Amino acid sequence: MPAVMVYAIGGGLIEVLISPILEACPTDNKESAMSLLHSFYCWGCTGVVLLSTLFFALFGTSHWKILALIWVLLPTANLILFTKVPIYSLHEEGESGMSISELFRVKVFWLLMAMMLCAGASEQAVSQWASTFAEKGLHIQKTVGDLVGPMMFSVLMGLSRLIYGKYGEKFNLDRFMKGSCVLCVASYLCISLVPVPIVGLIGCAICGFSVGIMWPGTFSKASAAIKRGGTVLFAMLALAGDLGCSGGPTLVGFVSSAFSGNLRLGILTAIVFPVLLLAGLCTFSRLVVKNVD
């Protein structure tokens, strides 16, 4: 348990720091760069699922400690790379960032926090249960379920972020995010209401594609709306997102358990998160227009 807590803290710090590091880089299209950055989270998840599943298939789950030692190579490589990477400041020379108390007094900040919570919940409410859904729906082993469920979700989510990262200058971020929310709602309905297992599994993959832009897109919107937010802003948004990542799957689990393990009903309940995110985006758009006027 202490080891889990320590690596969770380490992973959280990387998540908090790497987004503002990229935001400070002198790139032309920061929204695209942010999306491209977060696509590598998906490729990492895909690689971990694929390689870990392969390892367990070859050597058995009893050798999990050896696998943990092998994965130590990744944070070690990150440690070395971080010593080489030039880090720019988020603020102009002579400009200071906001304190937490200043940030808390900005009204749009709380809207962005709610949007991040919904983004995290929309993503993980399906992702965390994708393997179980595949196992129960298709009656397959856990090994195959891990490959078919979470890995397919991660690949499609990464593809969505890669597309925006490559062609972001051709898209309007606001419209892209709103369209993704609508697609996410459709995928939730497909998973929970269509009684054909393979269709539900396709819905899981579509959900992965739809949630791809939600997290990095909200980061980009926040950075543009709160210029002096700095690392504190990214840290608070990451906190809200992580709360959503925990709360979304928990809600699905509670509802499913209350209705005799009905996972479809649990996922249907979680549809509230992409709906609320869409409402938040519409409200955010009105606030931005009002401030410009």
Descriptions of predicted regions:
Residues 171-218:
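C-terminal transmembrane helical hairpin of 12-TM major facilitator-type secondary transporters
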Residues 227-261:
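A late C-terminal transmembrane helix in Major Facilitator Superfamily
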Residues 4-39:
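Cytoplasmic helix-loop-helix junction between adjacent transmembrane helices
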Residues 77-86, 271-293:
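Multi-pass alpha-helical transporter architecture, strongest
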Residues 106-159:
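Extracytoplasmic gate region of multi-pass secondary transporters
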Residues 28-29, 33-87:
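Helix-loop-helix hairpin linking two adjacent transmembrane segments in secondary transporters
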Residues 13-26, 212-226:
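Intracellular juxtamembrane helix-capping segments at the cytosolic ends
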Residues 54-60, 134-135, 167-168, 253-261, ...:
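Interfacial helix-cap and linker-helix signal at transmembrane-aqueous boundaries
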